[in-house]
Design a protein with these regions (language model features):
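Residue-level marker of regulatory loop/turn positions in helix-turn-helix DNA-binding domains and
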Residues: 7, 22, 37, 49, ...
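Extended, charge-rich alpha-helical interface modules
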Residues: 77-308
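Residues immediately within or flanking Cys/His clusters that coordinate Zn2+
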Residues: 10-12, 25-29, 35, 42, ...
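Short, intrinsically disordered terminal segments enriched in charged and Pro/Gly residues
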Residues: 1-17, 21, 61-82
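Cys/His-rich microdomains that often coordinate metals
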Residues: 19-23, 34-37, 52-53, 64
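Short cysteine-rich clusters marking metal-coordination/redox-active sites
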Residues: 15-18, 29-30, 45, 57-60
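Short metal-binding segments enriched for Cys and/or His
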Residues: 40-74
């Protein structure tokens, strides 16, 4: 049955690729320049009368035949019970969190994207080393005179090789620039994120919440300057499924903010962009694959890719 012959009240409008459903906003523009809600006219431009065969989806960025957007309740239910139901649950969880933050039009079109079992993560030991380094750097931004003693500490604890070249530059620069200090001050967010991954912080604060967990973080870590051997050797991860979802959440938030630069639209969230970026970076580092047996050196931190 053709979509226009179906009873309107029985139809659900939904992208065939990512399952995004129209939100009542105007997302479409005709080649004549007219902007309108394409579903109010079944894909036909009210201005120039051009009939569009395909419709672009704001959720996944793909164009599919306009007629395929119209589905019955039964067809939607069949879609929702098809494929890997575990990954479907993850899709719903991630997209619900995005919507809750105000990122309403970003959807996952490939369920495989949500499968953390295909990822290879850093060891808990290396994650602990990176957490301590980030914590120390954030502290030293406000205590520059203590840098020489911290260099000695890093070497004594045998984690100096895990300090990145940019971090070493800061540690040995007599007069670091203000911009460098400002950038490095955000390292505390990466450290807290890794602490959450390592079960040293119970809950990560929301990206739009000014509350922090620094006190809990500090209580569950060794004092800066103390021995790290026992602490690092006993580090262990929380469920990788939780870690991976947090990574994807911040990856999609980065995509959202990047897209704002190009589409000129207003930010509809209250997300702290700097916090989200630091989480995105440190979690991307955590799930970066390195050859088995290879040493995780500091250079790898500076090379962390946050492109989307």
């Amino acid at each position: 049955m053709l979509f226009w012959n179906r009873k309107k009240e029985n139809l659900i409008i939904q992208c065939s690729n990512c399952e995004w459903q129209p939100d009542g906003e105007i997302h479409w523009a005709c080649s004549c320049g007219h902007r309108w809600n394409t579903f109010k006219t079944k894909g036909k431009c009210p201005s120039c009368k051009k009939q569009w065969e395909n419709t672009w989806c704001p959720g996944c960025g793909k164009s599919t035949p306009h007629k395929d957007w119209y589905k019955t309740k039964e067809e939607v239910e069949k879609i929702e019970t098809t494929g890997d139901l575990v990954l479907r649950r993850k899709k719903k969880s991630l997209e619900s969190r995005l919507i809750d933050y105000g990122i309403k039009n970003y959807r996952v079109s490939h369920l495989e994207y949500l499968d953390h079992s295909k990822e290879k993560f850093q060891t808990a030991y290396d994650a602990g080393c990176r957490m301590i380094i980030l914590y120390a750097i954030a502290y030293l931004v406000h205590n520059l005179d203590e840098r020489p003693s911290f260099i000695d500490w890093f070497k004594t604890e045998k984690i100096w090789e895990k300090v990145s070249p940019k971090e070493m530059e800061f540690l040995m620069n007599p007069s670091p620039e203000e911009r460098m200090l400002m950038d490095l001050s955000w390292c505390i967010e990466g450290a807290i994120t890794l602490a959450w991954c390592l079960k040293k912080v119970d809950v990560l604060p929301r990206l739009d919440d000014e509350n922090n967990v620094v006190e809990e973080f500090q209580q569950n870590l060794p004092e800066l300057g103390d021995s790290l051997i026992l602490f690092l050797s006993q580090s262990e991860f929380r469920n990788f499924e939780e870690i991976y979802e947090e990574n994807l959440l911040n990856e999609l938030a980065t995509t959202y903010f990047r897209d704002l630069l190009f589409n000129g639209k207003k930010d509809t969230t209250r997300i702290n962009r700097s916090v989200s970026y630091e989480r995105h970076k440190v979690l991307n580092w955590l799930r970066t694959y390195y050859e088995e047996g290879g040493e995780v050196t500091g250079e790898l931190w500076d090379e962390t890719d946050t492109s989307t």
